[in-house]
Amino acid sequence: MRLVFMGTPAFSVPVLDALVAAGHEVAAVYCQPPRPAGRGKKPRPSPVQARAEVLGLAVRHPVSLKGAEAQADFAALGAEIAVVVAYGLILPQAVLDAPEHGCWNIHASLLPRWRGAAPIHRAILAGDAETGVCIMQMEAGLDTGPVLLREAVAIGAEETTGGLHDRLSALGARLIVEALARRAELVPEPQPEVGVTYAAKIDKAEARVDWSRPAVEVDRLIRGLSPVPGAWCEIAGERVKLLGSRLAEGSGAAGQVLEGFTLACGVGAVEITRAQRAGRKAADAAEILRGMTLPARLD
């Protein structure tokens, strides 16, 4: 099929690769413009742009799609379907209507749960037992369109947002290829009005660990914010990111170091399995502890 691909971050790259590998004609790749990055703040192309250029695909990165010229350029591509995955721009109705069969979105949740910007983070933060990927026919509302195909996956007891991100990206790549192959037989399923939740962007204020909370909540926070933005605490005045954890045996005063990198919470305890000191690379807990001594209690 003749497609337009619209995506920006690393999550979208396996999808683009899968579409090309399946033999689809990608008429153009739309992504966010290069952003300043690194110490020199030089413009850096997005992961999708970098991959598209390697694949020899035409890349477009308009700042907006609201203008008549941008919309005409999009329509002129003559796409049968636009595949959208974490693109980052709102698609006006004229863009949604331009492809012959509309725009299909790959969304990393089991809609209508976790509509919005941060569905992977929010699923772990909420303690969901499962999540998944939906292929959705886009409409004007925020992730409200009918679902064409879905698949659920269990969330591991020690899984982080980073690990789940990679699994769902691969699942989305497989599902979109399947959905395109089965387009003629798929029946759009309207989303139910019950069970709707919204996955708001992660606020940095959420990231500080409060050891007075129950261990189950602290564990979800650490795993749900790993690797970005990263839950954190202060150890001897140094901000340390906590990037991996598991529930542990033991109890004590909130923030008390019980053994190794196991800390008491308001109820129960959490073992930190991976962390990152300021200005250093992430490391397993054992390596972190070789380089620093924990106080008797953390704030």
From Swiss-Prot:
SUPFAM superfamilies: FMT C-terminal domain-like, Formyltransferase
Reactions catalysed: L-methionyl-tRNA(fMet) + (6R)-10-formyltetrahydrofolate = N-formyl-L-methionyl-tRNA(fMet) + (6S)-5,6,7,8-tetrahydrofolate + H(+)
UniProt keyword annotation of Transferase present: yes
Known EC number: 2.1.2.9
Keyword terms of this UniProt record: Protein biosynthesis, Transferase
Leader sequence residues: none
Any GO CC annotation of this UniProt entry: cytosol
Molecular function terms from GO: methionyl-tRNA formyltransferase activity
Enzymatic class: transferase
Record InterPro entries: Fmt, Formyl_trans_C, Formyl_transf_N, Formyl_transf_N_sf, Formyl_transferase-like_C_sf, GART_AS, Met-tRNA-FMT_C, Met-tRNA-FMT_N
Domain of life: Bacteria
UniProt-annotated binding residues for (6S)-5,6,7,8-tetrahydrofolate: 109-112
Function: Attaches a formyl group to the free amino group of methionyl-tRNA(fMet). The formyl group appears to play a dual role in the initiator identity of N-formylmethionyl-tRNA by promoting its recognition by IF2 and preventing the misappropriation of this tRNA by the elongation apparatus.
Family: Belongs to the Fmt family.
HAMAP family: Formyl_trans
UniProt-recorded name of the protein: Methionyl-tRNA formyltransferase
Organism: Dinoroseobacter shibae (strain DSM 16493 / NCIMB 14021 / DFL 12)
Gene of this entry: fmt
